[in-house]
């Protein structure tokens, strides 16, 4: 079993220090095989915010925790126009990582992160053709029994984001991106951006989308909440490429604790899900099914 912690939208500069400390302690105690951070490490891409994010990440690395980190749209300067258009991810590269499309592989999983942040948009993201070619190339030599995981900040598909039924935009070049993910044989796609937890089978979101399970993370440490959904992150146990467990670990105001626990299995009809534990009882998640999308 491969244990993966999936955090997103840390937003240093608009963070709660108590929650940052609690998340660090949680990770150090459980020691995941890999910690994935799917973008928006900072609130406004300021140097002081990158230094805060870097210090936190470096403490995890110093403790021996492997990490795979990608930028988000908030890691591109918004008001500093010179850097926004000429060097959009210069500070990210200086303080976090030079690698914008990191790759991780062990005996059980292969994981690729792709940068969807762009300087010409405020909040939207996209993938370019070179990244789609990289997606295909990286996974081409991967053994078929390994679980293939794609990480982006912006989700490949439109997602429900509001209580009134509002839906987000899909990532730019959506059709080509979905085709590339399908051809690469992606089993799980992790993303963030909307500060909402969500999971749904790709094949139920678009025709010819392939067999991936789409998993969204909420904001792990930010005070910027959507629909009063509390801070949270995902805790995945990957048994095989066709069987995973997903726990949503939720901040209850004093500590992180399990908010939901769902097992997913891929059968002939697609992904099926069932609750391993009772549905969430915390904050805005109360009373909702533990998997937020129909699977």
Which residues are covered by each model-predicted region?
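Short acidic, glycine-rich surface-loop motifs adjacent to enzyme active sites
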Residues: 143-161
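Active-site environment of divalent metal-dependent phosphoester hydrolases
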Residues: 13-18, 43-47, 70-81, 119-123, ...
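Conserved beta-sheet core of the metallophosphoesterase superfamily
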Residues: 165-242
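A short C-terminal boundary segment appended to hydrolase-like catalytic domains
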Residues: 238-295
């Amino acid at each position: 079993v491969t244990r993966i912690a999936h955090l997103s939208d840390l937003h240093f500069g608009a963070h709660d220090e108590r929650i940052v400390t609690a998340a660090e302690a949680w990770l150090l105690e459980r020691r995941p095989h890999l910690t994935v951070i799917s973008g928006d490490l900072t609130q406004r891409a300021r140097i002081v915010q990158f230094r805060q994010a870097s210090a936190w990440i470096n403490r995890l690395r110093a403790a021996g925790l492997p990490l795979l980190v990608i930028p988000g749209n908030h890691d591109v300067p918004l008001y500093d126009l010179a850097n926004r258009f000429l060097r959009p991810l210069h500070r990210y590269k200086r303080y976090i990582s030079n690698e914008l499309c990191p790759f991780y592989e062990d005996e059980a999983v292969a994981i690729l992160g792709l940068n969807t942040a762009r300087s010409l948009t405020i909040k939207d993201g996209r993938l370019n053709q070179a990244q789609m070619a990289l997606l295909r190339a990286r996974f081409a030599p991967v053994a078929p029994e390994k679980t293939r995981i794609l990480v982006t900040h912006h989700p490949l598909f439109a997602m429900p984001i509001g209580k009134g039924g509002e839906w987000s935009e899909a990532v730019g070049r959506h059709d080509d991106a979905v085709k590339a993910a399908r051809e690469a044989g992606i089993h799980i796609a992790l993303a963030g951006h909307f500060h909402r937890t969500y999971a749904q089978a790709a094949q139920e979101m678009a025709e010819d989308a392939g067999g991936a399970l789409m998993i969204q993370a909420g904001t792990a440490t930010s005070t910027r909440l959507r629909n009063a959904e509390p801070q949270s992150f995902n805790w995945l146990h990957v048994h095989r490429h066709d069987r995973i467990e997903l726990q949503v670990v939720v901040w209850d105001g004093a500590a992180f604790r399990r908010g939901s626990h769902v097992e997913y299995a891929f059968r002939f009809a697609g992904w099926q899900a069932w609750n391993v534990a009772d549905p969430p009882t915390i904050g805005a998640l109360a009373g909702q099914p533990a998997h937020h999308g129909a699977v």
